[in-house]
């Protein structure tokens, strides 16, 4: 068996501070903005010359938070309710022989200053600290295939849950808007995807959850109408 060695070229800075509630695919949370910081010796302006002319990028990265669990020949995709098993190569599961992922993100800006190269990204679906091993520009003529079929994932999942905020949290969000633009929209879009494990959907009203987004512990409860955010705790 041939082994290959790759070097990390950069690291992701993201509002997702833990893997819980990270969208299962890119593009589902449009307000999720973050950055890719290139590291030495790849943090050279010449290495990204011309990249600003592309609107979207493929980010190849390592599933660093799940790689110790090893790979599995079959997995249970959330889109199938978490009960049906599929071959790992027929899914985008993190439990792969080589823990490599790919994400299609929006490129908002390329910032180069001295020995710093930062790519500002949109529609991000990567956890903070994710190691990046490659960047490739997205080519619409070659990679957009409207006639392609995709089995159980032919279309994007519907944003399932209505999300509301208590009056106290709404006031808190207003005071944070200047420092955290689109924070309200970001929380709403993340929770609307219903990040709960498939087997826990349909639980009794009143069940509470929490997730670390930006610099806050966001706490919400299940209600008859959807999700209600009742606490925003600084971390």
Question: What residue ranges belong to the model's regions?
Answer:
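Short coil-to-beta-strand transition motifs
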Residues: 2-8, 95-105, 214
